Amino acid sequence: MQNITPEKLYKQIGQNVAKYRKEKGLSQLDLSLAMGYKSVSVVSGTEIYYNGKHFNIEHLLKISQILKVEISEFFKF
């Protein structure tokens, strides 16, 4: 098993969310609105792990349902 730090994991999850979001043709605003937020700040900051912001499991569950992607896909390196 790889030696993965929490920071590395959070960054990879953010990159994977961004990849699948773009594949589905959604903007950060589109995804934010679908998640119930009125601003892109949650998605934009967490996709790049800005100031330590990261997606929590509830975010990932919502995103997987919106994007129709298995939640496990977000954890792949």
Please identify what each model-predicted range represents:
Residues M1-E23:
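A short, Lys/Arg-rich alpha-helix, primarily the initiator
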Residues V17, L31-S32, V42-E47, F74:
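Conserved hydrophobic/aromatic packing and binding residues within compact polymer-binding modules
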Residues V17, Q28, I57-L60:
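Helix-turn-helix DNA-binding elements, focusing on the entry/boundary residues of the two helices
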Residues E23, A34, I66:
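Residues within the alpha-helical elements of helix-turn-helix
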Residues D30-L33, I63:
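Short alpha-helical "recognition helix" segments of helix-turn-helix
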Residues Y37-K53:
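Recognition helix of helix-turn-helix/homeodomain-like DNA-binding domains
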Residues Y49-Q65:
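Short, basic-rich loop-to-helix N-cap that marks the start of a DNA-contacting helix
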Residues I57, K68-F77:
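Short C-terminal boundary/hinge segments that cap the last helix of small helical domains
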